[in-house]
């Protein structure tokens, strides 16, 4: 599917859909619990649906009722799946799911789409082995497909958490292991996502110790109680509208955003404000209006998902914008550092690729044919670039937006953007 975009203004009110990260965590916690849970206002997208199917395959009973999921959990004792588990494009689901499967007896096999089969799992597989279960890559390359055989027992492991999902997977599942677990963290990127996982553990009354994110102790033999939660809006999805407002001079009011939530991407609003945009928090809404932007040096380690959109913002900021300390952006759905540099250069951007980020200088962009590489955040970021570039921009693999934000095109169109899809 192609996404066609022409230079146009967009403004208005947008209700941001539920957080993908919270939705997937809620589904796993509810599945691991014993009893019935309700998840209100979840994100309905390809990634979230992948999590639903994985939890079902492991024994959870999940029904969609109006705007909520009702989950009957398996009490920390997952079933042996009837077939190979396919996580689609969801890296979070894969990394959480393989350790959940290791809580039970028997073998499970996990795979995913082409992008998933290229994303690393090695450190998490080693941790699973260190904690008493078995896990290995069928191609012996630390990537899916992987085979997992339970049961986890507990003990001590190190983890090189180049992606926070490795550590989060251990934190989510280890309370249900019979013995205590000690985790030595040799590297940790994306700390806010770990904070989100810890927020859930606190909410559910789990006993653990966090020693400055270097060492974690998790008491074994615990249980998750059923939960009744409402999923907050997704700051990662809000980022695209925030950047559109900031670079165009228009105004958006973005509803369903809770600034007290642990999501790291809420930092985007303070970054854009520091660059010159006008930002006002109004309860559970954020009002953002564009103004002349000035380039900044930004440490992106905590917010790697914002790199594609902030690369676009840098094209419209005076001077130079540096997006630094985010090497993990290279192991997302695509190598987002390389892909954004490559595609924005096609539009005329003055942009330089670094090992751990990008340097962008103010540029006049021109529409052209672009490759989205099937990466939802790349496609949506290039769409924002296209709305502010001369002429027409055509982006391929537009269907990728369904991974996290199926209504992205409709929302922008309703706000006045000249944007549409076609085969």
UniProtKB/Swiss-Prot annotation:
Pathway note: Metabolic intermediate biosynthesis; chorismate biosynthesis; chorismate from D-erythrose 4-phosphate and phosphoenolpyruvate: step 6/7
Location of the active site: 305
Catalytic activity: 3-phosphoshikimate + phosphoenolpyruvate = 5-O-(1-carboxyvinyl)-3-phosphoshikimate + phosphate
Subcellular location: Cytoplasm
Cellular component GO terms held in the UniProt record: cytoplasm
Role noted for this protein: Catalyzes the transfer of the enolpyruvyl moiety of phosphoenolpyruvate (PEP) to the 5-hydroxyl of shikimate-3-phosphate (S3P) to produce enolpyruvyl shikimate-3-phosphate and inorganic phosphate.
Family from the record: Belongs to the EPSP synthase family.
Name of the protein in question: 3-phosphoshikimate 1-carboxyvinyltransferase
Gene of this entry: aroA
